[in-house]
From Swiss-Prot:
Residues that bind substrate: 225, 332
Organism: Bacillus cereus (strain B4264)
Biological process according to GO: L-methionine salvage from methylthioadenosine
Protein family (similarity comment): Belongs to the methylthioribose kinase family.
Protein name as annotated: Methylthioribose kinase
Annotated pathway: Amino-acid biosynthesis; L-methionine biosynthesis via salvage pathway; S-methyl-5-thio-alpha-D-ribose 1-phosphate from S-methyl-5'-thioadenosine (hydrolase route): step 2/2
Complex formation: Homodimer.
Residues at which ATP binds: 38, 53, 107-109, 242-244
Pfam families for this protein: APH
Entry's EC annotation: 2.7.1.100
UniProt keywords, alphabetically: Amino-acid biosynthesis, ATP-binding, Kinase, Methionine biosynthesis, Nucleotide-binding, Transferase
Family annotation (HAMAP family): Salvage_MtnK
GO molecular function, one term: S-methyl-5-thioribose kinase activity
Function (record text): Catalyzes the phosphorylation of methylthioribose into methylthioribose-1-phosphate.
Length: 393
């Protein structure tokens, strides 16, 4: 039959045909996806529920003029299963994957809330940073040369060649926001600030270096799109979803993206409500370092993990990269193709424009920063300096 796009009706029939519901069951189906690339259906018969996710052969956010390979669905399914080997508590269960139709059937997480929405609504999620720090440490360690024999790592790396979605990252994170490209999207009130950013040759040179790291450093399996919209949370649970951008890349990439999205939320808040975001930023790094260090000492397979002086160098390199990648993410989420609700939903125009100017300024500071130590307080310090400079709308 070949590939076809599901509807709510055909999604129900697919689920029944594959044994998830009895043929006579009264299954309610809704398309609930709010992402840019896929259909997501929730199916519920009153006793159990599942999620059916289908990759489209184009970017939904743009349309059929932007074709994409549906093989990304297989990459996403494989990534979730790899993550589950190391941190099963932090990912949804994958029930099945249909490569021909680019369909993945997964656990329904509707008991939880998308973390971005929860943070916008003022939720604090006390375990978020602990869970994400440990998730990152386990996945990044165990899929790298430190946790895998080199032969195994090369084989695994070959299964995560993801050209279409890597090209999206290359363009939308590292290239387009830093020049005159049609994909960019921002208010006219930002034009002077954007022009200044685009003319900053020092900034562009640093961005070029971070892009080159993304292109060439195949260090570990990264989620590739770890923002707060790719995480479900509750006060007691955290689940990482949507790793369709998964590929082998730099250790610091996911860390930087996650931190950047916490910073974007902090920029949307009044000063007295920001402390929980910096708590999560700082605790994410401390839990990552603590867990990564234990794995390095106890389970490192690379011979030189026995050299005590090497780990601090590795952690410093990861931190330096995370800082720069966070800066790139701040800028692309402010003036690039895919914005975030944290800033866009600020109702007062003057406040919204000021927050976006501050995001651009902070992004530039992070990209240019020459990190000499893995001091996680850096994010708080640069944030406060940026805000106190009084970037005016």
């Amino acid at each position: 039959m070949g590939y076809y796009s599901l509807t709510e009706i055909t999604a129900v029939q697919y689920a029944k045909d594959h044994g998830y519901f009895e043929e006579k069951a009264n299954v309610i189906c809704h398309e609930i996806g709010d992402g840019n690339l896929n259909y997501v259906f929730k199916l519920d018969d009153g006793e159990k529920s599942i999620i059916i996710k289908q990759a489209l052969p184009y970017a939904k956010v743009v349309g059929e003029s932007w074709p994409l390979s549906i093989k990304r669905a297989t990459i996403e399914s494989k990534a979730l299963q790899i993550f589950a080997q190391y941190v099963p508590d932090y990912v949804p269960v994958v029930y099945s994957h249909d490569e021909e139709l680019a369909i993945t059937v997964i656990e329904d997480l509707s008991r939880l809330t998308i973390t971005r929405k929860g943070l916008i609504d003022g939720e604090e999620y006390p375990l978020l940073s602990q869970h994400i720090g440990r998730f990152l440490a386990h996945v990044l360690f165990y899929t790298s040369d430190f946790g895998l024999q080199s032969e195994e790592k090369r084989i695994l790396e070959g299964t995560f060649v993801n050209p279409d979605l890597c090209k999206i990252t290359e363009d939308l994170v590292f290239t387009d926001p830093f020049g005159h490209y049609d994909t960019n999207d921002y208010e006219p009130d930002l034009q002077l600030v954007v022009d200044e950013l685009w003319s900053d040759k020092t900034l562009k040179l640093k961005v070029a270096q971070y892009k080159y790291k993304f292109l060439t450093r195949k260090e570990t399996l990264i989620h590739g799109d770890l923002h707060t919209g790719s995480i479900f949370s509750s006060p007691s649970e955290t689940k990482v979803i949507d790793p369709e951008f998964a590929t082998y890349g730099p250790f610091g990439f996911d860390i930087g993206q996650f931190i950047a999205n916490l910073l974007l939320n902090a920029l949307s808040r009044e000063e007295e409500k920001r402390s929980v975001l910096f708590f999560h930023i700082e605790k994410t790094w401390s839990y990552f370092v603590e867990t990564f260090t234990k794995l390095w000492i106890g389970e490192g397979v690379e011979a030189y993990t026995k050299e005590k002086q090497w780990l601090p160098i590795i952690l410093q390199n990861i931190f330096t990269d995370a800082v720069g990648f966070a800066g790139c993410e701040l800028i692309r989420r402010t003036i690039g193709l895919a914005h975030v609700a944290d800033l866009d939903e600020i109702e007062n125009k003057e406040t919204r424009i000021q927050a976006k100017k501050q995001a651009l300024s902070l992004g530039k500071e992070l990209i240019k920063y020459e990190s000499k130590s893995a001091d996680i307080q850096l994010f708080r310090t640069l944030f406060q300096q940026t805000v106190s400079r009084g970037v005016k709308a």
